[in-house]
Amino acid sequence: MDEQTARDESLARQLQEEEDNDFYHKQQRERQNENDKNNSNQNLFMQKLYAAIETIKAYEDEYARAMALSCVPIDELEERKSSSSSSSSLGKKDRFVVELLKWFKHEFFEWCDKPKCSKCSQTGTNMTCIGMAKPTEDDLEFGANRVEMYQCANCYNARTQFPRYNNCVKLLETRTGRCGEYANAFTLLLRALNYEARYVMDWTDHVWTEVWSEEQNRWIHCDSCEASFDEPRLYSEGWGKKLSYVVAFSIEDGVTDVSRRYQKMDDDMIERRRAIVQDEEFVKKATLIFTNQLRHSLIEERRTALRIRDEEEIEELRMIDMTEAERSKNRNLPGRLTGSLEWRKARGELGHKAGSEEEKEKEEAQVVMTNTTTTTTTTAESNLKDKITKEFWKLRNEGISPNEAAARAAENIRERLGRM
């Protein structure tokens, strides 16, 4: 081998070593970045668990429970339970929960897409969210770390704040909000009534409750926004949500991954879960650690009973696999009903029949409007009907029911005409 060839080979080896070294360090950096990303995702997951545990601790406070009990018309709900035929196949305690759900949704709490203007008290298309406001000391005292800011087009852009309270006692006073406020207040009521209840958090931005049925020996889904009882596939098969993690929280029962109850664990769902936390074992360990911490002060007999119940629930969730007949039945579940059509549409929660949902509402509206307005065809009456119809749809988009919207639309337009 001549000297030049030796130098060339030496240079080639050196270049190859440098290339291999660069590749090695690049792989190390990529692994480190991946580890950092996984650690970051795990930290975010843990933060959500911590936050939910802080929320449920308030349900065990004696003052909070006393305030909650003072709000519930127990005797009246007992009477309704006895006279209701819709839930006659259920046991007494479960029937009471059904009546509590109806009362909570229709009489106690009020849904809020947008707050009423602080000046004119109107809400709807006049109110526009313009961002977030800085929470006041009072807001922070009642857990409102987020405060939405709205302005009213009818009042020279007058501004109104909407604090998102997370204090369950404060919510008994305000009685308004969205799914977070609904689930928080309703779970407190169940605990005050001595039901075993779990606060359930969905990682795609919804919250609801589960109640332990002594009569059925299982956890039952309760959504106080929809007055829905024992319809766990409502979100995946009704609303069309693509769920990932669904976790239930209770001071005694601990922290439980109940995702299988709410959506079939297929490949798509597994992929969505991995996008949140890559390591499923991490989730199992985290929920177990929190559960053990929450149960630490319980007597051994109670801990043993809960461990047995855990094992039964694990088996129940493992065996859940919807047959085609069950899937067909669940496809009849409705899309989301609470909130304005515009708001539900923006969240993609109208369900699998989203295209026909608006047509159905229009058909219902036409029936209501025909009963509310005149059917004669004079020009003046036709113009009046057009005005009332426009007002009707404005009110419907604010989440008001067809019958109420029709009555208010006719009244509003005639009032305006009377002032002209």
Predicted regions mapped to residue ranges:
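Alpha-helical and coiled-coil interaction segments, frequently adjacent to or embedded
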Residues: D2-T174, R178-E181, M201, Q216-M420
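Cysteine-dependent deubiquitinase/ubiquitin-like isopeptidase catalytic cores across multiple families
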Residues: T187
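Short, well-structured beta-strand/strand-turn elements
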Residues: R191-D205
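Active-site beta-strand termini and strand-to-loop segments that position acidic
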Residues: T209-E214
